[in-house]
Each structure stands twice: as structure tokens, then as C-alpha cells.
Regions:
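Conserved ASCE P-loop NTPase core motifs with emphasis on AAA+ ATPases
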Residues: 9-64, 68, 75, 223
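AAA+ ATPase active-site-proximal loops
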Residues: 48-211
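A short helix-turn-beta junction within AAA+ P-loop NTPase domains corresponding to the substrate/partner-engaging
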Residues: 214-223
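Short beta-strand-to-loop transition segments that serve as allosteric relay/switch motifs
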Residues: 6-12, 204-205
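Short beta-strand edge/capping elements of PAS-family sensory modules
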Residues: 2-4
Length: 223
């Protein structure tokens, strides 16, 4: 299943996990894979001693800082980064969501590959579908040449879907197929293609609330 990272503002991430409805904006809590604390602490120490160019990318400077809260947050991103699985990041407005996704990418084994961000809040359903999955030549009137899919451009790298709760049900269900089987088809094509890209999604609405409001498919949480 998806690993979920929740961003909150406060300091401590110790103690039992809270429900999404109990959470304040900004602190980092990790749900999902096992926590390899000693290994993570070692990785954090290595990162702190590395030159900035070794791990920084555009936007990731917002996660630079020596505070205990920020160090704890980065270490939890490292915990997620070492598990090469789909990841959902949630936080309120003002939290560094896209920089967190970029940090996740450069902290993973995919750091040398492409990071392809898509803003799901922009454009109509058809435009978003074309940006994510691309289209073949003659897929529709005026499609005189094929357009590559973001998922193809992110091959072996990371595809970021920002504001996924704004994507239509049609788009989200195609993403379910992608996450479940690694399969996808460009618009206008019946040929199945396969992807090895890691998908990272950002939600600005609490996941459970988004599911209950019909804005986020529960099936995506299961992939």
C-alpha cells in the first residue's frame, strides 16, 4: 500500500499515531513501512556532512535547517525514500509539500533520474489526462504528432502529482491501473506500456476527508 507522509507544524513525532482528523498542520508523521532507526540516523549524518550539491535540488532548500523538528522531518523522509513505493504527502497550505517531494526524490536511489512534476489543479480533465499519459498521433482531430507522457518522461525517476484530489475520477482510475500493475496507455492507443517510475502524490485535504468527499479514490490508497 501507499506510504503516507503527513506534514504538521509542531515539534514532536513521538508517541502513538493519531487519526487524520486529530492532526494539526505541519508536523511529520510516517505511516507505512518499518522504521529502521539506526540506519536512518546514519543516513542523516551522512547527508549533513555531504556537499549541498550532492542532495539539493530546486525547491529543496526550504527543507534545510538545523532545528530538531526539521531534522526529524528529513529523517522521516529518508525512511520513506529507502522504500521504493508509491507515496502520498499531505499537508495544509504553507507547508513545504513540493520541496518535500523533491527531497524524497534526491534522497532515494532515483536521484540521478528525472523528477517530473504535474499540477493536477491546472486545466480541464482532458488536458490533465494528456499531460500525464500523453497521446499518439491522430488520437483526436488536430493531433498531428504524438506527445510524450509525463509518466514516460519520469521513467526510472519520480512522477509528482500535485493536488491529486483535483483530478477527475476518470484520471484517478487510470492511475489505479498504473499503480496496481505498472501498466498504462497513451490517449488514442490500445498498446499497453509499462512504467518503472515512482509516483508521489500531494493532497492538500486530509486523505480520509478527501475520500469521504468523493475527491480521492480509496483504491489509490490501496496501491
Amino acid at each position: 500500500p501507499m506510504v503516507v507522509v503527513l506534514l504538521r507544524a509542531a515539534a514532536s513525532v513521538e508517541g502513538p499515531a493519531m487519526s487524520v482528523g486529530d492532526m494539526d498542520p505541519g508536523q511529520a508523521i510516517l505511516w507505512g513501512k518499518a522504521r529502521h532507526t539506526a540506519r536512518v540516523e546514519s543516513m542523516v549524518r551522512q547527508l549533513r556532512g555531504a556537499p549541498a550539491g550532492d542532495y539539493a535540488c530546486r525547491g529543496s532548500d526550504e527543507l534545510v535547517g538545523g532545528s530538531e523538528a526539521m531534522s526529524g522531518f528529513r529523517s522521516r523522509l529518508l525512511q520513506v525514500a529507502e522504500h521504493d513505493v508509491p507515496t502520498l504527502i499531505h499537508g495544509s497550505c504553507g507547508t513545504p509539500l513540493e520541496p518535500a517531494a523533491r527531497w524524497l526524490h534526491v534522497s532515494s536511489g532515483r536521484r540521478g533520474e528525472s523528477f517530473v512534476p504535474i499540477d493536477c489543479r491546472e486545466g480541464a480533465e482532458s488536458q490533465l489526462l494528456l499531460r500525464i499519459f500523453g497521446h499518439v498521433r491522430n488520437a483526436f482531430p488536430g493531433a498531428n504528432q504524438a506527445v510524450p507522457a509525463a509518466i514516460a518522461l519520469a521513467e526510472r525517476g519520480t512522477l509528482l502529482l500535485d493536488g491529486l484530489e483535483h483530478a477527475s475520477e476518470r484520471v484517478q482510475m487510470r492511475l489505479v491501473d498504473l499503480l496496481a500493475r505498472g501498466q498504462w496507455q497513451p490517449v488514442g492507443s490500445q498498446v499497453t506500456r509499462y512504467s518503472t517510475a515512482r509516483v508521489v502524490a500531494i493532497l492538500r485535504q486530509p486523505p480520509i476527508q478527501a475520500v469521504m468527499a468523493g475527491k480521492f479514490r480509496r483504491e489509490l490508497m490501496d496501491q
